[in-house]
Structure formats: C-alpha cells, structure tokens
Amino acid sequence: MGLMTWDDATAWLIREQHGVLGRAQLAEAGLSEATVRWHLSRRWRILLPGVYQLDRGRPTRAQREIAGLLAAGPKAALRGLSAASWWGVTAADPGDWVHVMVPPPRRTRRVAWLDVARSTITDPAMVTRGPFQVCSPARAVLDAAQHSGSPDVAAAIGIEAVQRRLVTLDDLEEELCRRNQRWSA
C-alpha cells in the first residue's frame, strides 16, 4: 500500500488538524476500513476510538486537543483547564487530560485522557480558530478555577487572566450571572 497520496482538500485538512483525522474524515477521503487497519499496523497511531494520528510520533498537546474534539463530536469545545491553557493562562495546567464540553443530548464520559462534560449553559462568545472550538476566556477561567483542585491555583488562574487582560472582572461577573440564571425562575 505504500505512501499515501492525498487530494488537495484532504492534504489541507491534515495540515490544519496537525496530522489527526477521524474515521469519518478518512472514509470521506476514500479510505476503506482495510486500508485504515493496514496503516494503523505500520505507520499510524490510534489516539482515541475512531481518531487517528497519521504518524507514530508522540502526540503534541494540539494533536491531543484536536483528537478530543473529534472524538467528542460536533459542537464539542475545549473547556476548563484545557481552554484556559489554550488561551495562554500558564497557571492552568491540564496535565495529561483534555477537557471538552458538549451540548445535550450528548453524555458526560471519560475515555483514556479525554474528559467530556455535558453543558446546558450557552456560551455566546465561543471561538473557532482552525480546528479548535474553544469556550470564551471568561468561561475558561471560571471553569478552570472551579476544577483546579486548590484555592491557590484557582486564585492564580484568575489573577493571571486579569493581569494579562484576557478577561476583565466584569467579564467574569457576567459569566457568573449567566451560570446563575440557569437556576432562576
């Protein structure tokens, strides 16, 4: 089977997604299950069920995040520590985990290093940049602080985000109000 020759659209997608593709994307590119299995036995790596890295190297943070978004499905977005780290908050360290959120009716689940949480709270400031869909900076900071595991780390995340002008105190207050409206009559 040898080296793959990709059409222009697929080659662009491979570059855009840092060498990570989902099963449906490979099928759309014309690859059979047998061809995918052959490449997995020789050149590719399974990152998550149905998501493949098109080389055998150690996956980068970006590749793992893209894999998490592909595995979680349409409308998935980075959240919490992963999103805050993506926005550049160094105090937000997701470690080996990739945290994503999905809208209902999708379910909360954990697979390998992927943590998928369902959220009914809308985020009007969600951002899409290339293959990344990411919650707003304010939501990322509040989620990251909530799940940081330590009051000191939570404070560091908030302080760094404000000092870097990623968010304002008004942004954080507005996001808190959006969360609290969910429980109002």
Give each language-model segment a name:
Residues 1-185:
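Short gly/ser-rich loop at a beta-strand->alpha-helix junction or flexible surface loop bordering the NTP-binding
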